């Protein structure tokens, strides 16, 4: 196929958009691949749509190869199925809700587990119909509070979601492995650098869960790896190594001290080291108690206290994952006024216990450890408060931040921090949704069998940005051949009529060989054409320029930057096609 730039709906920009934060956002807009419509909403222009479709093609290839069958559900979905699973409430403000003219409630689908489950239940009734894998590539909607980074975090996005249905756990595990391997092939074909990390399932439910993260310093997802063992996990899934308990007998009694104006960990540590406690005190010796209010979907709000070592902050993502599907918020001044037993900056376990506030602590706070913490009175702290003797928590919670150098959960060495962009997520859902809809089939023995499910997602439109993030340079985009809009960008850099005719004929020859060509036949200067060719990022650039008169054209590799001259003879198109196909 030949596309002439003189006819292509395209306008490139010389300057970065003012609101663009990451390279992919800047380049995709500058190169005319996408255009913003509103916060989190983008139009796909011809070149961008070709990239999107190429990525979809790779995904379809690999999904079909593992026996997936493509279907398509509506994006506009009724309330009832989501009420059955309680996700109508759980989603909160993160989905778009609307009513029809009769007052019936709908949402714009963020995911489709309910519809997949109901459809399979309605169509199949025997164990003989399984295993089954269905998938769709469809537009999804989420009301992102802060859409950012272009199409990396948008309110409307294209996603591939697939679901496996099996009659037993062995079938589910086989489907999970098949999807995991298919995802690896997909991302390898797209030339995305990625890691597979242990993850939490969140509102999706289920047991085993892994994320595919594209490595990128601009990624929103923090993950850790242990170089010694290969352990990887996103920060939400890291399990803190729990220390052994310590003997309590012989520990000195806890003592309450007047500590003055010490509402922060830093001021408390400063006081402790001036108070001659007989040892050097660090923030790790203090116990920080953070108060939040938690509301389960459809339930009442309760107070919850989180205790962490004072040298650690509470990580919002880890806390949110631990409390899923509940909503939570820090207490504000009005909340403290309603609960005068909570003395801001001086909260301790004693007042929490006396007022029946649920108290969850970091796994490092084990019996026998001694802490400096609030005494529930302004300007007073207790020194030597021993876990298991002076206070007992209601349980543990993984809410403290994970840091570089923390021990790996497998004990093999320290953790190294990195950042990535989530491009895929796979879950072993089990029977969460089939339980909700009583999705049973008759087993081999004639008795009902509850179906078990797996859920597997890929961010299709996000992958366009991810490839752009990982494959660009200071000049512009550098698309891998599997996703590039065209195989070859043929630049006519000579106004001579014979050169133009030769370039047009070369484009036709390449087309006959199955090479997709973007022909820059515009009446523009060579400099403008070269800048656009580098910005647009096709993997190969062919230049028909001044060398045409001497029977020579240039072939440039956009990735390596290397240029070589080819003889403009009968085999020219074949030579270029050979380079393109590798």
From Swiss-Prot:
<comment type="subunit">
    <text>Homodimer.</text>
</comment>
<dbReference type="Pfam" id="PF00587">
    <property type="entry name" value="tRNA-synt_2b"/>
</dbReference>
<protein>
    <recommendedName>
        <fullName>Proline--tRNA ligase</fullName>
        <ecNumber>6.1.1.15</ecNumber>
    </recommendedName>
</protein>
<dbReference type="InterPro" id="IPR002316">
    <property type="entry name" value="Pro-tRNA-ligase_IIa"/>
</dbReference>
<dbReference type="InterPro" id="IPR004154">
    <property type="entry name" value="Anticodon-bd"/>
</dbReference>
<keyword id="KW-0648">Protein biosynthesis</keyword>
<dbReference type="InterPro" id="IPR050062">
    <property type="entry name" value="Pro-tRNA_synthetase"/>
</dbReference>
<dbReference type="InterPro" id="IPR045864">
    <property type="entry name" value="aa-tRNA-synth_II/BPL/LPL"/>
</dbReference>
<dbReference type="InterPro" id="IPR044140">
    <property type="entry name" value="ProRS_anticodon_short"/>
</dbReference>
<dbReference type="InterPro" id="IPR002314">
    <property type="entry name" value="aa-tRNA-synt_IIb"/>
</dbReference>
<comment type="function">
    <text>Catalyzes the attachment of proline to tRNA(Pro) in a two-step reaction: proline is first activated by ATP to form Pro-AMP and then transferred to the acceptor end of tRNA(Pro). As ProRS can inadvertently accommodate and process non-cognate amino acids such as alanine and cysteine, to avoid such errors it has two additional distinct editing activities against alanine. One activity is designated as 'pretransfer' editing and involves the tRNA(Pro)-independent hydrolysis of activated Ala-AMP.</text>
</comment>
<dbReference type="InterPro" id="IPR036754">
    <property type="entry name" value="YbaK/aa-tRNA-synt-asso_dom_sf"/>
</dbReference>
<keyword id="KW-0547">Nucleotide-binding</keyword>
<keyword id="KW-0436">Ligase</keyword>
<keyword id="KW-0067">ATP-binding</keyword>
<dbReference type="GO" id="GO:0006433">
    <property type="term" value="P:prolyl-tRNA aminoacylation"/>
</dbReference>
<dbReference type="GO" id="GO:0002161">
    <property type="term" value="F:aminoacyl-tRNA deacylase activity"/>
</dbReference>
<dbReference type="Pfam" id="PF04073">
    <property type="entry name" value="tRNA_edit"/>
</dbReference>
<dbReference type="GO" id="GO:0005829">
    <property type="term" value="C:cytosol"/>
</dbReference>
<keyword id="KW-0963">Cytoplasm</keyword>
<dbReference type="InterPro" id="IPR007214">
    <property type="entry name" value="YbaK/aa-tRNA-synth-assoc-dom"/>
</dbReference>
<dbReference type="InterPro" id="IPR033730">
    <property type="entry name" value="ProRS_core_prok"/>
</dbReference>
<dbReference type="GO" id="GO:0004827">
    <property type="term" value="F:proline-tRNA ligase activity"/>
</dbReference>
<dbReference type="InterPro" id="IPR023717">
    <property type="entry name" value="Pro-tRNA-Synthase_IIa_type1"/>
</dbReference>
<comment type="similarity">
    <text>Belongs to the class-II aminoacyl-tRNA synthetase family. ProS type 1 subfamily.</text>
</comment>
<dbReference type="GO" id="GO:0005524">
    <property type="term" value="F:ATP binding"/>
</dbReference>
<dbReference type="InterPro" id="IPR004500">
    <property type="entry name" value="Pro-tRNA-synth_IIa_bac-type"/>
</dbReference>
<dbReference type="InterPro" id="IPR036621">
    <property type="entry name" value="Anticodon-bd_dom_sf"/>
</dbReference>
<dbReference type="Pfam" id="PF03129">
    <property type="entry name" value="HGTP_anticodon"/>
</dbReference>
<keyword id="KW-0030">Aminoacyl-tRNA synthetase</keyword>
<dbReference type="InterPro" id="IPR006195">
    <property type="entry name" value="aa-tRNA-synth_II"/>
</dbReference>
């Amino acid at each position: 196929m030949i596309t002439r730039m003189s006819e292509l709906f395209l306008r490139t920009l010389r300057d970065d958009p003012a609101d663009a934060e990451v390279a992919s956002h800047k380049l995709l807009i500058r190169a005319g691949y996408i255009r913003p419509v509103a916060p989190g909403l983008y139009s796909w222009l011809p070149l961008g749509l070709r990239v999107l479709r190429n990525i979809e093609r790779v995904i379809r290839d690999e999904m079909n190869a593992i026996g997936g069958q493509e279907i398509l559900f509506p994006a506009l979905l009724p309330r009832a199925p989501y009420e059955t699973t309680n996700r109508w409430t759980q989603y909160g403000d993160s989905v778009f809700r609307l009513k029809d003219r009769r007052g019936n409630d709908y949402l714009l689908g963020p995911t489709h587990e309910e519809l997949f489950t109901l459809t399979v239940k309605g169509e199949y009734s025997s164990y003989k119909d399984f295993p089954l894998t269905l998938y769709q590539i469809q537009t999804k909607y989420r009301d992102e509070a802060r859409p950012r980074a272009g199409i990396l975090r948008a309110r409307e996005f294209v996603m591939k979601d697939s679901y496996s249905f099996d009659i037993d756990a062995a079938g589910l595990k086989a489907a999970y492995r098949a999807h995991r391997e298919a995802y690896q092939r997909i991302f390898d074909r797209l030339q995305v650098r990625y890691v597979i990390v242990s993850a939490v399932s969140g509102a999706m439910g289920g047991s085993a869960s892994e994320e595919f993260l594209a490595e990128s310093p601009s990624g929103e997802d923090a993950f850790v790896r242990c170089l010694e063992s290969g352990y990887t996990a996103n920060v939400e899934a890291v399990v803190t190594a729990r220390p052994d308990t310590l003997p309590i007998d012989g520990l000195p009694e806890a003592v309450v001290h007047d500590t003055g104006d010490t509402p922060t960990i830093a001021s408390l540590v400063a006081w402790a080291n001036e108070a001659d406690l007989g040892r050097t005190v660090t923030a790790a010796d203090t116990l920080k108690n953070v108060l939040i209010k938690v509301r389960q979907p459809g339930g009442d709000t309760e107070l919850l206290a989180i205790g962490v070592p004072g040298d650690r902050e509470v990580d919002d993502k880890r806390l949110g994952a631990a409390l899923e599907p509940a909503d939570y918020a820090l207490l504000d001044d009005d909340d403290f006024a309603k609960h005068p037993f909570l003395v801001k900056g001086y909260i301790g376990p004693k007042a929490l216990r006396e007022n029946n506030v649920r108290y969850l602590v970091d796994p490092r706070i084990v019996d026998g450890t001694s802490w400096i913490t609030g005494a529930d009175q302004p300007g007073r702290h207790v020194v030597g408060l021993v876990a298991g003797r002076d206070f007992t928590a209601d349980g543990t919670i993984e809410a403290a931040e994970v840091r570089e150098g923390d021990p790996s959960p497998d004990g093999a060495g320290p953790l190294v921090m990195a950042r990535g962009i989530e491009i895929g997520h796979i879950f072993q859902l089990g029977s969460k949704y089939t339980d909700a809809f009583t999705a049973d089939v008759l087993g081999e023995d004639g008795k009902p069998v509850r179906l078990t499910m797996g859920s597997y997602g890929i961010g299709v439109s996000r992958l366009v940005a991810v490839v752009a993030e990982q494959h660009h340079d200071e000049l512009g985009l550098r698309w891998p051949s599997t996703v590039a809009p065209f195989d070859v960008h043929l630049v006519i850099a000579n106004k001579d009529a014979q050169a133009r005719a030769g370039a047009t004929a070369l484009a036709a020859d390449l087309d006959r060989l199955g090479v997709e060509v973007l022909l820059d036949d515009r009446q523009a200067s060579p400099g403008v054409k070269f800048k656009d060719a580098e910005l647009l990022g096709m993997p190969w650039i062919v230049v028909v320029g001044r060398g045409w008169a001497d029977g020579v054209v240039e072939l440039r590799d956009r990735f390596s930057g290397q240029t070589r001259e080819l003889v403009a003879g009968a085999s020219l198109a074949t030579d270029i096609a050979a380079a393109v196909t590798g």
